[in-house]
Amino acid sequence: ITAQRVPMTSVPETVALFNGCGGMSSLLVALGVALFPEAGGSDLVAVVSIVVSVFVGAITFTGSIVAMAKLQGWLSTPAWMQSRLRHAVNIALAVLSLVAAVKLIASGEGGQGLWLLVIGSGLLGVGVTLPIGGANMPVVISLLNSYSGVAAAAAGFVVGSQLLIVAGAMVGAAGLILTQVMCDGMNRSLVSVLFGGALGASSGGGGGGGEYT
């Protein structure tokens, strides 16, 4: 019903919202099993799957919400996010998420490491998506679609669902292929789309790829 009522001009925002819902679903499943290990097991495979599902799911959720808000005109890029400072912030968030993931795997149970991972990866999703301009946003939405599939596949390992693993892998692969095709159509690499804006703006190059809104 929602898809039928949405005008064609708002389809990208709708897809971003659906991606966010998928990422949040995988995140909640992983959190449930992490907080209540009897629901899915606490062996190494289960813990690693929880880490992947939480990390990718949180990035997908926050990144998709930011993408939708930017396309709707509800958000704009802060000035400091257009500089190299954003790379330092994102690296710090990635390191925080990595440390939290290692701590969670080492402990094998939910706790401080789990919530640090949720916060760090969620903020990382915002930090990566917020500086990207509207012209590149469809590529980001396609990549986030791939992420939602990866998160779903990881959640499938968490709960032991082969159907969820297969479906998530298919969505992840299809989204990644579509992302690469879109990048080829724009004659740009995925790295330049995600990280090249501030570098292009600071060096005076990039053929307009550094435009931010």
PLM features: residue spans?
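Membrane-interfacial segments at transmembrane helix termini in multi-pass membrane proteins
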Residues: M170-T213
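Cytoplasmic-side transmembrane-helix entry/capping segments in multi-pass membrane proteins
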Residues: T9-G22, A79-I91, P138-Y147
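Membrane-embedded transport cores of multi-pass solute transporters
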Residues: L117-T129, V139-G185
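Alpha-helical transmembrane segments
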Residues: A46-T60, L164-A174
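Core segments of transmembrane alpha-helices
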Residues: N90-L98
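Mid-bilayer segments of alpha-helical transmembrane spans in multi-pass integral membrane proteins
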Residues: I1, G20-L35, I50-V66, V181
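Transmembrane alpha-helix boundary signature
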Residues: T2-V11, L27-D43, S107-G108
